[in-house]
Structure formats: structure tokens, C-alpha cells
Swiss-Prot record:
Residues 1-15 are mitochondrial matrix. It is a single-pass membrane protein. The keyword NAD does not apply. Residues 37-64 are mitochondrial intermembrane. Component of the cytochrome c oxidase (complex IV, CIV), a multisubunit enzyme composed of 11 subunits. The complex is composed of a catalytic core of 3 subunits Cox1, Cox2 and Cox3, encoded in the mitochondrial DNA, and 8 supernumerary subunits Cox4, Cox5a/Cox5, Cox6, Cox7, Cox8, Cox7a/Cox9, Cox6b/Cox12 and Cox6a/Cox13, which are encoded in the nuclear genome. Keywords: Membrane, Mitochondrion, Mitochondrion inner membrane, Oxidoreductase, Transmembrane, Transmembrane helix. It comes from Neurospora crassa (strain ATCC 24698 / 74-OR23-1A / CBS 708.71 / DSM 1257 / FGSC 987). This is Cytochrome c oxidase subunit 9, mitochondrial. GO terms for molecular function: oxidoreductase activity.
Length: 64
């Protein structure tokens, strides 16, 4: 049998690796933004509004 040349697969691996990393970073960025603006910020704003209301009620009771 004749020895056949085998094509190097390094280019395919590099392209696949770059694609995988790009997709992972993109999906991670979307998920992080979804968490940050969909859960974290609304909860933080609700907490801040609650304590602001408590402080205003306390100030009104103290007559300040």
C-alpha cells in the first residue's frame, strides 16, 4: 500500500476552538445581562425603595 498524505487538522481545530470560545463568551454575556437587568437590578431597586419608604416614615414620625 502506498502511504497517503494526511492533511493536518490544526486549522480546523483552531477554527473550532475560536468558534467555541466565541459562542461561550456570547452566551455568557447574554446570560449575565439577563441576570443583571432581569433579576438583580429589579430586586436591588425594590430593596432600595423599601428602605427609602421606611426612612421617610421614620422621619415623618420624628417630625423632621
Amino acid at each position: 500500500m502506498a502511504a497517503t498524505a494526511v492533511r493536518p487538522i490544526t486549522g480546523m481545530l483552531r477554527r473550532g476552538l475560536i468558534l467555541d470560545i466565541g459562542i461561550a463568551l456570547g452566551v455568557g454575556f447574554v446570560m449575565a445581562n439577563g441576570y443583571w437587568y432581569g433579576y438583580h437590578m429589579p430586586r436591588t431597586n425594590a430593596r432600595d425603595n423599601y428602605y427609602k419608604k421606611l426612612e421617610e416614615e421614620r422621619a415623618a414620625r420624628m417630625g423632621a
